């Protein structure tokens, strides 16, 4: 760690560098004195390098803080609201991944995730219906928690079709994206039997609330939608037969 007493040494080093560029010992200066000055200069240079590293870390931290609005959990809970009207403006890929990570991101080396899961069985699957995302082609993508990445499912902007499956709710069509949460019930029911269905429903609530709070932190608007035709959503998104849609969450910039 740097201490205040080191700064005179740093200043001395800078003065020496500016005046002579390098230390050249003269016959009037003993070898011991010359070596001592060189040692101080080397020490000053090392601490200058450390200062630069500290500054770089601070700059990086400031940039990261600027991406997400600093707020306590209490503030986020107070500010969270359902938003159904969105500006015609794109989201960034970074924002999208932050939202998906909040819902099902991996937080432990063994695979633990952001939302609690009965038996750590993780029956949920997250799909991204992208319509207006910077540098991301419109289409459907599936979230891979282990890599925090998207895999391509199908091309094309399907927001209008998804809105039709959600009984014509305009917010589903007008959001920059829709996050669709599906469940593979069998992952949980094979251990817990019929009770496992309840555990899945509890878990999707955990994941959705995480996404809501992340959106609030990012200054984005969203609403959780549960009214839709299951078969229609499954076909439009391109889900497998064992995946049942539970939530459609449109997200966009606030107007």
Please give the residue ranges for each predicted region:
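A glycine-rich helix N-cap at a beta->alpha junction
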Residues: 238-255
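Short, surface-exposed helix-loop/turn micro-motifs enriched in polar/charged residues
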Residues: 118, 222-225, 241
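Conserved hydrophobic/aromatic beta-strand scaffold that supports enzyme active sites
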Residues: 142, 178-180, 248
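Short, low-complexity, disordered segments immediately C-terminal to signal peptides
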Residues: 29-41
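N-terminal amphipathic, basic helical "cap/leader" segment at the start of enzyme domains
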Residues: 41, 47-48, 53, 58-174
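Small-aliphatic-rich amphipathic alpha-helix that forms the alpha element of a beta-alpha
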Residues: 80, 99, 126, 177-187, ...
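Solvent-exposed coil/turn segments that connect beta secondary-structure elements
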Residues: 104, 131-133, 145-146, 182-186, ...
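Secretory targeting signatures
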Residues: 1-30
């Amino acid at each position: 760690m740097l201490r205040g007493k080191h700064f005179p040494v740093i200043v001395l080093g800078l003065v020496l560098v500016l005046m002579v560029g390098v230390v050249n010992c003269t016959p009037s200066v003993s070898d011991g004195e010359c070596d001592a000055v060189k040692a101080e200069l080397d020490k000053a240079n090392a601490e200058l390098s450390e200062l630069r590293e500290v500054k770089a870390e601070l700059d990086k931290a400031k940039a990261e803080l600027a991406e997400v609005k600093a707020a306590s959990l209490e503030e986020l809970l107070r500010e969270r609201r359902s938003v159904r009207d969105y500006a015609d403006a794109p989201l960034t890929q970074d924002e999208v991944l932050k939202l998906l990570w909040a819902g099902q991101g991996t937080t432990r080396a063994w695979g633990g995730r952001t939302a609690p899961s009965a038996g750590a069985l993780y029956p949920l699957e997250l799909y991204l219906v992208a319509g207006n995302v910077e540098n991301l082609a419109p289409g459907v993508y599936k979230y891979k928690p282990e890599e925090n990445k998207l895999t391509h499912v199908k091309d094309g902007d399907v927001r209008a079709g998804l809105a039709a499956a959600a009984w014509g709710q305009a917010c589903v069509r007008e959001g920059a994206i829709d996050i669709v949460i599906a469940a593979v019930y069998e992952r949980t029911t094979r251990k817990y039997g019929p009770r496992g269905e309840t555990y899945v429903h509890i878990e999707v609530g955990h994941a959705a609330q995480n996404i809501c709070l992340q959106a609030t932190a990012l200054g984005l608007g969203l609403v959780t939608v549960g009214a839709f035709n299951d078969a229609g959503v499954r076909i439009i998104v391109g889900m497998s037969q064992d995946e049942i849609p539970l939530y459609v969450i449109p997200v966009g910039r606030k107007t």
